[in-house]
């Protein structure tokens, strides 16, 4: 599927990280989502009910990132991907990228980041029903 809905660099302040200082002080993270799904029905109908709202995607990412705490940004990304796949059946695959510009690394860098790609066959809900 070539069609995509993108949410790029949603800024959140949160307390994720392995170190106690990361939990205590918190830091900024940037979350990007790329959802692959068929956008033709929405394009033809001009009806938001025929697509996935990028506002809803951003709200899910923001809610999970600010109301839950994870030691690893990999776990944060998994939680976002699982929730989006469970909530929106139209999404075929989702890529979640977490940028951590203030990662506690003794080097000069723009950011550390992870990116995961998950699809329906990877989701926990699908696995449990097999």
From Swiss-Prot:
The active site is at residue 100. Substrate binds at residues 22, 54, 73-74. SMART domains: FolB. It is an enzyme of class 4 (lyase). One of its GO terms (molecular function) is dihydroneopterin aldolase activity. Pfam families: FolB. InterPro entries: Dihydroneopterin_aldolase, FolB_dom, GTP-CH-I_C/QueF. It comes from the Bacteria. It catalyses: 7,8-dihydroneopterin = 6-hydroxymethyl-7,8-dihydropterin + glycolaldehyde. Its EC number is 4.1.2.25. Pathway: Cofactor biosynthesis; tetrahydrofolate biosynthesis; 2-amino-4-hydroxy-6-hydroxymethyl-7,8-dihydropteridine diphosphate from 7,8-dihydroneopterin triphosphate: step 3/4. One of its GO terms (cellular component) is cytoplasm. GO terms for biological process: folic acid biosynthetic process; tetrahydrofolate biosynthetic process. Keywords: Folate biosynthesis, Lyase. PANTHER family: DIHYDRONEOPTERIN ALDOLASE 1-RELATED. Catalyzes the conversion of 7,8-dihydroneopterin to 6-hydroxymethyl-7,8-dihydropterin. Belongs to the DHNA family. This is Dihydroneopterin aldolase. It comes from Methylorubrum extorquens (strain ATCC 14718 / DSM 1338 / JCM 2805 / NCIMB 9133 / AM1) (Methylobacterium extorquens). The lineage of its organism: Bacteria, Pseudomonadati, Pseudomonadota, Alphaproteobacteria, Hyphomicrobiales.
């Amino acid at each position: 599927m070539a069609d995509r809905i993108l949410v790029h660099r949603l800024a959140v302040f949160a307390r994720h990280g392995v170190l106690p200082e990361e939990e205590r002080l918190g830091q900024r993270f940037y979350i990007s989502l790329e959802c692959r799904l068929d956008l033709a029905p929405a394009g033809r109908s001009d009806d938001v009910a025929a697509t996935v709202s990028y506002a809803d995607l951003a709200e899910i990412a923001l809610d999970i990132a600010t109301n839950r705490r994870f030691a690893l940004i990999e776990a944060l990304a998994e939680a976002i991907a699982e929730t989006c796949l469970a909530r929106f059946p139209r999404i075929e695959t989702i890529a979640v990228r977490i940028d951590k510009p203030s990662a506690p690394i003794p080097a000069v860098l723009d950011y550390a980041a992870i990116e995961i790609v998950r699809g329906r066959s990877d989701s926990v809900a699908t696995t449990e029903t097999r």
